[in-house]
Amino acid sequence: MLILFNTFAELPEAYKAFAPTVDVLPLIPLFFFLLVFVWQAAVGFK
């Protein structure tokens, strides 16, 4: 099963230049999640 996931984890050759961007993409929802807490702290958790 691990071999199957490893096969899909590699980007095609044409997209190798975008590898650093693709590595950061999963973190974007986490930034929004943290932004919710910062926003609520700013308005006093109403």
UniProtKB/Swiss-Prot annotation:
<keyword id="KW-0812">Transmembrane</keyword>
<comment type="function">
    <text>One of the components of the core complex of photosystem II (PSII). PSII is a light-driven water:plastoquinone oxidoreductase that uses light energy to abstract electrons from H(2)O, generating O(2) and a proton gradient subsequently used for ATP formation. It consists of a core antenna complex that captures photons, and an electron transfer chain that converts photonic excitation into a charge separation.</text>
</comment>
<keyword id="KW-0602">Photosynthesis</keyword>
<comment type="subunit">
    <text>PSII is composed of 1 copy each of membrane proteins PsbA, PsbB, PsbC, PsbD, PsbE, PsbF, PsbH, PsbI, PsbJ, PsbK, PsbL, PsbM, PsbT, PsbX, PsbY, Psb30/Ycf12, peripheral proteins PsbO, CyanoQ (PsbQ), PsbU, PsbV and a large number of cofactors. It forms dimeric complexes.</text>
</comment>
<dbReference type="Pfam" id="PF02533">
    <property type="entry name" value="PsbK"/>
</dbReference>
<dbReference type="InterPro" id="IPR037270">
    <property type="entry name" value="PSII_PsbK_sf"/>
</dbReference>
<comment type="similarity">
    <text>Belongs to the PsbK family.</text>
</comment>
<protein>
    <recommendedName>
        <fullName>Photosystem II reaction center protein K</fullName>
    </recommendedName>
</protein>
<keyword id="KW-1133">Transmembrane helix</keyword>
<feature type="transmembrane region" description="Helical">
    <location>
        <begin position="25"/>
        <end position="45"/>
    </location>
</feature>
<keyword id="KW-0793">Thylakoid</keyword>
<dbReference type="GO" id="GO:0015979">
    <property type="term" value="P:photosynthesis"/>
</dbReference>
<feature type="propeptide">
    <location>
        <begin position="1"/>
        <end position="9"/>
    </location>
</feature>
<keyword id="KW-0674">Reaction center</keyword>
<dbReference type="GO" id="GO:0009539">
    <property type="term" value="C:photosystem II reaction center"/>
</dbReference>
<dbReference type="GO" id="GO:0031676">
    <property type="term" value="C:plasma membrane-derived thylakoid membrane"/>
</dbReference>
<keyword id="KW-0472">Membrane</keyword>
<dbReference type="InterPro" id="IPR003687">
    <property type="entry name" value="PSII_PsbK"/>
</dbReference>
<keyword id="KW-0604">Photosystem II</keyword>
